Amino acid sequence: MYAENDTIVAIATPPGKGGVGVVRVSGPKARAIAHEVLGYDPKPRHAHYSPFFNEEGDTLDSGIALLFIAPNSFTGEDVVEFQGHGGPVVLDILVKRIVSLGARLARPGEFSERAFMNDKLDLVQAEAIADLIEATSEQAAHSAMRSLQGQFSKEIENLIESLIQLRIYVEAAIDFPEEEIDFLSDGKVLNDLDTLLSQTQSVFASAKQGALMREGMTVVIAGRPNAGKSSLLNALAGRESAIVTEIEGTTRDVLREHIHIDGMPLHIVDTAGLRDSDDVVEKIGIERAWKEIDQADRILFLVDATQTNEVSPERIWPEFYARIEHHDHITVVRNKIDLSEEAQGIDLSLSHPVIRLSAKAGNGIDVLREHLKACVGFESHAEGGFMARRRHLEALTVAEKHIQLAKQQLLSANAGELVAEDLRVAQNALSEITGAFTSDDLLGRIFSSFCIGK
């Protein structure tokens, strides 16, 4: 275990060579370390160009030093940043010098963790820092910045405040039992519960869009050999990612592509043709293909339109259909319509969606892209969204469930104690999102996924 009031140091810029490298120090010894490295006490919040000295007074490097005094810093502690040349060796030398002066190497995410512990930002904002760094599209970067600025946190805090006010009202009825029936049957509690449900569902819908922006969806292209799976992968990716030949079994392993559809990450997996094979390498690829299919958000069941007019996967390939656990994840894709002379488009009236396209000619690819967005409810034109994570959705789901339970308790039993308890559980679930009510284990998992120096 580390002391909570010790001083930490880390390189804050990415590994490798660059024009500038930043070493960040935070903790009670930051000012003393700055004095030893610079040879003088820097003025807070001013940029000082200076040599960086070792213990013998020799120059290690030169650059800019910035000192921030607690609580007016990112971490809420004394912080000093040394901005020198971006070579890994010279940065390591500077870090060793700072460690010799009483600092220790920071854990991944420890600077952000200290900012959270010192109330400089909440847990959603801390996560947004990592999401901003990892953003893979402009839309994702904008959404992460809105979360960092507190937009998502404000939505959650408003829900929590409404829950608190309703709990106060209900618990007042419990404290004055002779008034309880009047309190709980006057319509206010029911109306407030309905309002809370509506607000929670609205925040969940926005958070779901943010989670899709961050995590995207995984789509597996599956089917018999030579149905055109690799051609479809290339068409969706917009480049030649997979080898396409007329020879069955060309794809022997799982191929992956990562693209964006209007800002939503799409993880495309092209599987080996599913068939019985004596080839050892191909058999391994087929087993991997089944694992990917089991984990997919959507399965594109590719059919060669020149071989059959059937659209039911259960009839086309009964063995494949029987092995699939989530039949509602299947979309039938009739490929090669340029040869079968079918019209491109989508049919949603059947047991499974059916899309007719030509991967080789590119006809119907836009229809497929729009269908994939619709499958997960992604709204590409939604404005002002914020970034969210799976754990946020889970917490909102728990909160909504217990608000629903509170409503049921009110209507069925008029039981104030049970209503108040469900409201308390809902409040705690929402408080986990911002970190106001969070286990140390969860904090450890979140911050350990951050970069060192953040």
Swiss-Prot record:
Function as written in the Swiss-Prot or TrEMBL entry: Exhibits a very high intrinsic GTPase hydrolysis rate. Involved in the addition of a carboxymethylaminomethyl (cmnm) group at the wobble position (U34) of certain tRNAs, forming tRNA-cmnm(5)s(2)U34.
Species of provenance: Hahella chejuensis (strain KCTC 2396)
Family under the similarity heading: Belongs to the TRAFAC class TrmE-Era-EngA-EngB-Septin-like GTPase superfamily. TrmE GTPase family.
Binding site for Mg(2+): 230, 251
Pfam families linked: MMR_HSR1, MnmE_helical, TrmE_N
GO MF annotation list: GTP binding; GTPase activity; metal ion binding
EC number(s) from the headed UniProt entry: 3.6.-.-
GO CC terms: cytosol
Residues that coordinate or bind GTP: 226-231, 245-251, 270-273
Cofactor note: Binds 1 potassium ion per subunit.
UniProt protein name: tRNA modification GTPase MnmE
Subcellular location: Cytoplasm
Cofactors (names): K(+)
Positions of K(+) binding: 226, 245, 247, 250
Binding site for (6S)-5-formyl-5,6,7,8-tetrahydrofolate: 24, 81, 120, 454
Alphabetical UniProt keywords: Cytoplasm, GTP-binding, Hydrolase, Magnesium, Metal-binding, Nucleotide-binding, Potassium, tRNA processing
Main location: cytoplasm
InterPro entries: G_TrmE (IPR031168), GTP-bd (IPR006073), GTP-bd_TrmE_N (IPR018948), GTPase_MnmE (IPR004520), MnmE_dom2 (IPR027368), MnmE_helical (IPR025867), P-loop_NTPase (IPR027417), Small_GTP-bd (IPR005225)
Subunit comment: Homodimer. Heterotetramer of two MnmE and two MnmG subunits.
Domain TrmE-type G: 216-377
GO biological process, one term: tRNA wobble uridine modification
